[in-house]
């Protein structure tokens, strides 16, 4: 599965922000991550709405970054190949912003310990979109099974401590919903070696 331009762009932005985190000593540092754009634990962003986007490009540590970039590498091309680069970017940004908003609402009601950040809302958006898109356009049965397995594992993972279930669920709902309404990209021709 080759990487597409939109997937590569998101990947590049996540890596660039992680390098900024390293340079600023922000790895696992709530105060510095807040300065870079993470979501606060009390749900109060004081009209700093840009945090709904920046939080998606920040990661707590290298493990967190690697998990989200692996998901991007696996799911991004599935969505991008079937729906196009613009749809991929719309799904990522919409799922990430909605996920961040869901987290803020939850934190307003039940304050959390520590900042919220990461691209998992966007990745769950891709997972929901990929599931819909592989059923909208005929795809290999094993890809469908793998995506369903990924959904089950992702939902189980959402129950772990310090993982934002609300962020994952909101991202999944947004990605799934958008994938039902976006136009499918025309199939790419298959190259057959003679």
Residue ranges of model-derived segments:
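A detector for small-residue-rich transmembrane helices and their helix-helix packing motifs
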Residues: 1-194
